[in-house]
Amino acid sequence: MAPWLQLLSLLGLLPGAVAAPAQPRAASFQAWGPPSPELLAPTRFALEMFNRGRAAGTRAVLGLVRGRVRRAGQGSLYSLEATLEEPPCNDPMVCRLPVSKKTLLCSFQVLDELGRHVLLRKDCGPVDTKVPGAGEPKSAFTQGSAMISSLSQNHPDNRNETFSSVISLLNEDPLSQDLPVKMASIFKNFVITYNRTYESKEEARWRLSVFVNNMVRAQKIQALDRGTAQYGVTKFSDLTEEEFRTIYLNTLLRKEPGNKMKQAKSVGDLAPPEWDWRSKGAVTKVKDQGMCGSCWAFSVTGNVEGQWFLNQGTLLSLSEQELLDCDKMDKACMGGLPSNAYSAIKNLGGLETEDDYSYQGHMQSCNFSAEKAKVYINDSVELSQNEQKLAAWLAKRGPISVAINAFGMQFYRHGISRPLRPLCSPWLIDHAVLLVGYGNRSDVPFWAIKNSWGTDWGEKGYYYLHRGSGACGVNTMASSAVVD
């Protein structure tokens, strides 16, 4: 492994490099009451995943269950605790040594999207070894002091992204000794600000440990960012990296080829020094995709809204729900591609407005009515990967649908983001957004990006990314509808 990759792996910043903190258990499981009926289906699914690959006679049996659910629309995230009974095993073909019957205490996290279950986490151990707090990461509040220090927010723009360019960041003063008290206070403010409720003390304790790990991770991202961005507490700070990626991002963007689009005609590379379609009436308000990986739909409707405004003179807020329900080439909350969405709009005969076909945040039956369609598109085009030409196209033609690597966005607060290229690879794009403008802040060039995570994220719902360096793959999947 290259030296800089070894360092980034040590810092826990490469995808999947750090496991999420395990969820703590409650020892007094005998006192659990009957489970809510809605917990049974996700629990059975988790049990099925637990037993997958096990020989007959060795499969565990479900015992007691408890848990909680967090909802958005019909998307549900279940945090479950269950006891499992493992049968004794005396078959030498299956077990090397005889194994007596034992009880396991497990925690599972299951995502349910219209009955489709995904197991996000499985953590099990014998009951007698699971005591309150045992699942928490060792020294959760101070693990950062052993690996990375209280790092300065400003540092040189090191273009040579190697081991030597970041190793000095490990040699600063350690984190303060009163960090646990500070973190508890910050977490309390987070809970109040974002109206979080947790089912039990164990769940709250576990979310606190996730929060602390996330703050350490945000500090590392802050230290290695070459822009002016500030990272820290956001509404996603109590979600593990895996939860965040599964619920809000769109890995289909890097896995599926999508429909082939023709290349857009060049408008040249002469662009005004700055441009912002928000101030010119071509951009609707920031929307919120909720617990649904539907960023692709919001990116496309935002582009079509702008194209319709520029060519027809009317700004309409268009329906993402129509695409979730009626675009059969894409996968609704499980992800999609802008190129497929353009084809779906064209084949359907247009888009209805948000008022007529409102967003639900989950897939339902297609209720598109051609009579209610307010806009149409004639075609779609792929744009240049040259950022100067992209800026010129945007200034002349309107907002652009793009896809980016969302590294660091879970903790983004404000400023111009510029992660190191190895951390924000252009080949690992997983989030679709909308370019609405560009400019400079204190001589730092940026793209102004409309996101779909609500106005309580980022700069009132907007993300600012470095322009001119191909940051996070912003130039790799740019496209637009064509409205004549």
Curated annotation (Swiss-Prot):
Chief subcellular location: other
EC number, as in UniProt: 3.4.22.41
Molecular function as annotated in GO: cysteine-type endopeptidase activity; cysteine-type peptidase activity
Subcellular localization(s) per the UniProt record: Lysosome
Catalytic activity, as annotated: The recombinant enzyme cleaves synthetic substrates with Phe and Leu (better than Val) in P2, with high specificity constant (kcat/Km) comparable to that of cathepsin L
Record PROSITE patterns: THIOL_PROTEASE_CYS, THIOL_PROTEASE_HIS
Residues glycosylated per entry: N160, N195, N367, N378, N440
Tissue: High expression levels in heart, skeletal muscle, brain, testis and ovary; moderate levels in prostate, placenta, liver and colon; and no detectable expression in peripheral leukocytes and thymus.
Enzyme active site: C295, H431, N451
Pfam families: Inhibitor_I29, Peptidase_C1
SMART domains documented for this protein: Inhibitor_I29, Pept_C1
Gene3D superfamilies given in the database record: 1.10.287.2250, Cysteine proteinases
Keywords: Disease variant, Disulfide bond, Glycoprotein, Hydrolase, Lysosome, Neurodegeneration, Neuronal ceroid lipofuscinosis, Protease, Signal, Thiol protease, Zymogen
Disulfide cross-links: C292-C333, C326-C366, C424-C472
Source superkingdom: Eukaryota
Chain's role: Thiol protease which is believed to participate in intracellular degradation and turnover of proteins. Has also been implicated in tumor invasion and metastasis.
Disease involvement: Ceroid lipofuscinosis, neuronal, 13 (Kufs type): A form of neuronal ceroid lipofuscinosis characterized by adult onset of progressive cognitive decline and motor dysfunction leading to dementia and often early death. Some patients develop seizures. Neuronal ceroid lipofuscinoses are progressive neurodegenerative, lysosomal storage diseases characterized by intracellular accumulation of autofluorescent liposomal material. CLN13 inheritance is autosomal recessive.
Protein name: Cathepsin F
